[in-house]
């Protein structure tokens, strides 16, 4: 008893939880016997007051929790009856309905008249004519309720298509109008409650839908911003940036998304890479110009078609390593027709030496438009010292032309 009494005393003083309060009630009797007189009064007062307050607090929230559930259930319960009522008329109209709907009545017909007429078929419990309250005149239809289903069926058979006050009347089974009148206010009262949460939910859903959609819309933009950065080096390798950079102002205005992707990174990056690569960029151009010059040589002379093939096979690794800036080939292609006649003019020089280097030099020098072959070799010989020996070597091995520069470059190759 000592252990439980201690556990009960401490909660009675603290009154922290509802369980402790309930224990303080049950444990108040043993605590009296064990505790002193002063502690009794304190424990009793403390235990009684917090226990009541805590218990009331603990009991009240579940009641509150139940109370909202009650109205929610009440709000939910009324709508099913209208659905049942909607489905029931079809069933009752065939089987159980005791009310006849009499339509197309004249304004002279009263409820008493209907009761007399339909009373011939059986006991009539209730008769009602729909009134237009604004004008206080009958709307032209009424309801007659019979006590027995058989009587209602007889009345429906005889009175459907009969004449009352010179008008042909339609009689059909329906539900009494009172249920119709009384039922709509319930669903109407319940409907706003439902509609309000639905509208709130719809608004919340719309907001939720709007929220994720906006980030989704923004996410593709972010992706596009990132994707061009990732894709930009590839187009640079594929010669796109230089074609786009001169044409970019014209292409940016129409605003095709693909071109924007290609153009936006050059706007951001070209400043830094152009500054950083400007000194280093010319050598890669020089290295790359000859490989594209070689196919044109091949076109010119079939004998040289065989020689460049080994060059292409062996040279691709350095080209791939230096591939990212392929900007010069555009200029090479645009100026290539001018340089071809230059080759024909330089035929007086040994054809292998004059034509080969002229094509290489003219194409590699992206800034010289159509210079004489003599000027080109001077500029290119300085810039292309590293790669000429490679081709010179191969050309000398394939073709009997030997040039002085080839022997030193092989160490540069390695």
UniProtKB/Swiss-Prot annotation:
Taxonomic superkingdom: Eukaryota
Gene Ontology CC terms, in alphabetical order: nuclear speck; nucleolus; nucleoplasm; spliceosomal complex
Post-translational modification: Phosphorylated by AFC2. The phosphorylation status regulates intranuclear distribution.
KO phenotype (gene knockout): Several developmental defects, including defects in flower and leaf morphology (petal development), delayed flowering time and root growth. Hypersensitivity to glucose (Glc) and to abscisic acid (ABA) during early seedling growth, accompanied with an enhanced ability to accumulate ABA in response to Glc. DNA methylation establishment and maintenance defects. Altered alternative splicing pattern of several related SR genes.
Amino acid composition bias (Basic and acidic residues), ranges on this chain: 205-220
Stated induction or repression of this protein's expression: Levels of the isoform 2 are altered in response to sucrose depletion (Suc) and temperature changes; reduced in cold but increased in warm temperatures.
Record-listed Phosphoserine modification sites: 77, 256
Tissue: Especially present in actively growing regions and dividing cells. Mostly expressed in roots (primary and secondary root meristem), shoot apical meristem (SAM), leaf primordia, pollen and inflorescence, and, to a lower extent, in leaves, vascular tissue, hydathode and fruits.
Motif Nuclear localization signal 3, residue numbers: 284-291
Required for isoform 1 function in petal development as annotated region, ranges: 218-219
Composition bias type Low complexity, residue spans: 10-34, 42-60, 176-191, 364-373
Assembly and oligomerization: Component of the spliceosome. Interacts with AFC2, U2AF35A, U2AF35B, RNU1, SCL33 and SKIP. The interaction with AFC2 depends on phosphorylation status. Interaction with RNU1 defines initial 5' splice sites and interaction with U2AF35B 3' splice sites in the early stage of spliceosome assembly.
Entry protein name: Serine/arginine-rich splicing factor SR45
Gene: SR45
């Amino acid at each position: 008893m000592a252990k439980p009494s201690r556990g009960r005393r401490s909660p009675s003083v603290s009154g922290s939880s509802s369980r402790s309060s309930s224990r303080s009630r049950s444990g108040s009797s043993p605590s009296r016997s064990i505790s002193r007189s002063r502690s009794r009064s304190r424990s009793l007062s403390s235990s009684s007051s917090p226990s009541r307050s805590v218990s009331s607090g603990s009991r009240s929230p579940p009641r509150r929790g139940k109370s909202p559930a009650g109205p929610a259930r009440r709000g939910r319960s009324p709508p099913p009856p209208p659905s049942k009522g909607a489905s029931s008329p079809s069933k009752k109209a065939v089987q159980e309905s005791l009310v006849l709907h009499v339509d197309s009545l004249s304004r002279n017909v009263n409820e008493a008249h209907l009761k007399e007429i339909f009373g011939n078929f059986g006991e009539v419990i209730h008769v009602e004519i729909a009134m237009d309250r604004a004008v206080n005149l009958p709307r032209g239809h009424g309801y007659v309720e019979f006590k027995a289903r058989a009587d209602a069926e007889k009345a429906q058979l005889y009175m459907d298509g009969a004449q009352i006050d010179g008008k042909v009347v339609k009689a059909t089974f329906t539900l009494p109008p009172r249920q119709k009148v009384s039922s709509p206010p319930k669903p109407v009262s319940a409907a706003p409650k439902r509609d309000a949460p639905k509208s709130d939910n719809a608004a919340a859903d719309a907001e939720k839908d709007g929220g994720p959609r906006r980030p989704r819309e923004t996410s593709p933009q972010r992706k596009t911003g990132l994707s061009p950065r990732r894709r930009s080096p590839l187009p640079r390798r594929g010669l796109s940036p230089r074609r786009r950079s001169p044409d970019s102002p014209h292409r940016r205005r129409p605003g095709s998304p693909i071109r924007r992707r290609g153009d936006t990174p050059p706007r951001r990056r070209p400043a830094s890479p152009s500054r950083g690569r400007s000194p280093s960029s010319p050598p890669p151009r020089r290295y790359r110009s000859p490989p594209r010059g070689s196919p044109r040589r091949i076109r010119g002379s079939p004998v040289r078609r065989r020689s460049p093939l080994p060059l292409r096979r062996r040279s691709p690794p350095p080209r791939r390593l230096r591939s990212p800036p392929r900007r010069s080939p555009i200029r090479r292609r645009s100026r290539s027709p001018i340089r071809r006649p230059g080759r024909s003019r330089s035929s007086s020089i040994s054809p292998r030496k004059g034509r080969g280097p002229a094509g290489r030099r003219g194409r590699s020098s992206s800034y010289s438009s159509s210079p004489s072959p003599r000027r080109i070799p001077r500029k290119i010989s300085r810039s292309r010292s590293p790669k000429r020996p490679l081709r010179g070597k191969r050309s000398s091995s394939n073709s009997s032309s030997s040039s002085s520069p080839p022997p030193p470059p092989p160490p540069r190759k390695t």
